[in-house]
Amino acid sequence: MKKRVLAVVMCALMAGTAFTGFKDAGDDKELVLFTWEGMFPQDVLDDFEKETGVKVVYSNFDIDETMLEKLSMAKGGDYDIVIADDYILETAIQEGLAEKLDKDSLENIGNINPLYQGQFYDPDDEYTVPYGAGIPLIVYDPEQVDIDIKGYKDLWDPSLEDSIALTANYRVINGITQLSMGESMNEEEVDVIKKTGEKLLELAPNVRLIQDDNTQNALLNGEASVAFLYTSQVTAALAENPDLKVVYPEEGLGFGIMGMFIPSEAPDKDAAYSFMDYIMQPEVAAKCTDYIGYYSTNKAADELVNPDLVVPDDVTKGEIVQNVSQDADAQYQKNWTEFKAACD
């Protein structure tokens, strides 16, 4: 759980999936789904094929910037459905890469929880449908940590040297540093962001690893004793070790929404609408929510999902990382590059 101008992350592109999205004319009917790995239970995809005759071809990316770059290179084509984070949705819409939705083709659109509609990235809900929501949190092993962690600022405690696992979203990690300093996660002043970078460098000695996929494993296998995790990773960690302690940071929460959209030049828009509507069926939405471990954005599915994944009353009061100016984003990226180098 965000930028007017986004740098091309070449190393991420090299690491991304090799699937191009192109289909031979002789192939059976296919829908190309482009999102992170592990976002759908296989039986949901298989059942869609049984119901429609459309095979889902799953193409994954590692970070949102990889998705945007590939979709831009394809000029809004190659992929039929994309699921990505809120901030990148705004950029995709601004760059003309998202199809304006025909709501008449989405019978189940009324199942979406209004809490997640009318957001900054799509204020009139013209292009996107929420798929899940979350708040990244601190999780730690109380048997291995000598302090009582209450907020982001505690991550800087010297006793945590070489013990923290972080997710790899540069804006989010800059953002929690800003919250620890009493600043907004969406600060635009470059001089203030530079101070964020200085503070972030002070965290480097405490960082054991930075990775976006399965970050919780470092906590579970003992490589790290503290982790900053996405909602799904928190859920996975607690399922394996319920003795871990979850921290709702006292400085405030970050909050994010994942959304689905149909690319502007999607090869099969009819199949895309069918898939999007299928995913909004309560029973299907509940299966997806339980599988990915994010908060449900489908109010019709709430009574069917794990109660822990029904949105808490105040979760949407958290701050969402949003797009910032070119100069501000460049400084955030500079902070991140220097921080990662210091962690090596």
Task: Label every model-predicted segment.
Residues 194-202, 240-264:
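Periplasmic-binding protein-like
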Residues 57-59, 208-210, 245-247:
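General small-molecule cofactor/ligand-binding pocket signal
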Residues 1-31, 343-344:
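Short, low-complexity disordered leader/linker segments with a strong preference
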Residues 254, 258, 263-320:
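Mature extracytoplasmic/periplasmic domains
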Residues 24-91, 217:
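Early extracytoplasmic/lumenal segment of secretory-pathway proteins
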Residues 89-91, 226-243:
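A ligand-binding cleft/hinge motif common to bilobed small-molecule-binding domains
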Residues 41, 78-79, 83-206, 210-220:
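Extracytoplasmic ligand-binding site segments that recognize negatively charged/polar headgroups
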Residues 305-344:
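Extracellular/periplasmic bilobal clamshell ligand-binding domains
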